[in-house]
């Protein structure tokens, strides 16, 4: 009997070692799935839909919230860069149809008010076209973070928001939020930035110039003040600039004067044959709001340093809204990729 007992203990011990080794392999998984998505805030939806005669009212935020939830679940990403977060989406009002409530407790949100820089909660922090970060708590943990502004003159304001704006630099509320994060499965630390750049003209200064300055400020500040050299990083944003436009081409694509060598995930995936079906056939990240056709712009981008790109795609699907009819959840399409820490 004693011999059988020792054999039994040995079997259990070997099994435990085997299971432990398997769990260890899972825990060391070096991949992370990321997304950038402009959600089209409730205020902008209402203003646009009310001004048009051919826009389906199911595109208001409240009836569209269930479509947005389906899209987010379909994407199944570990971390999101969201743009245009307002009170209805975050849940300061209309809590039952807020994306924050619908997604549930498995996700954490990090936002700082683009009005005064305070961290946003249910009771504090003003929101308007606010960029933010949403992440799966079982995969990513937050270490620290903050906000800087894209619309200020860096020589005068040092990227601190002021009530007035220099027309050459655009809307002072345009901002980038950043976070230093830990990827739990691999134990890797990385930086994640979410931003929304300008698409308007101010005081006779044209959109291209304003957008150029936003692009310059974003990349320069991230390079010199936010991300340390040697740490993996991701910039996921609505740049409001195509790859061929001056803002992106001059200040985003050109790495020659920067410490960091960020690269566009789309271009990496295209060159390596890792584009998804939709991105390969139709690399467009916007629709025309009336849903009659796709847009022609690819203005939402993910930039990386310190990662291998495993795949990249764009979700151009429609989802069921409150009345059962199918619509695009936003006027943008979500851009997503699977990355591997190098």
Where does each model-flagged region fall?
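Active-site-proximal beta-strand elements of phosphoester/diester hydrolases
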Residues: 31-50, 54, 144-148, 189-199, ...
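Active-site neighborhood of phospho(di)ester-bond hydrolases with catalytic His/Asp-centered motifs
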Residues: 81-83, 110-114, 234-238, 264-267
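Acidic/histidine-rich helix-loop elements
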Residues: 36-64, 153-170, 201-210
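Active-site beta-strand/loop signature of hydrolases that rely on acidic residues for catalysis
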Residues: 33-39, 68-92, 134, 179, ...
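Bacterial N-terminal signal peptides
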Residues: 6-15
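Structured beta-strand-rich core segments of catalytic domains in phosphoester-bond hydrolases
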Residues: 85-191, 197, 314-315
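Metal-dependent phosphoester-hydrolase catalytic domains
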Residues: 139-141, 222-234, 240-342
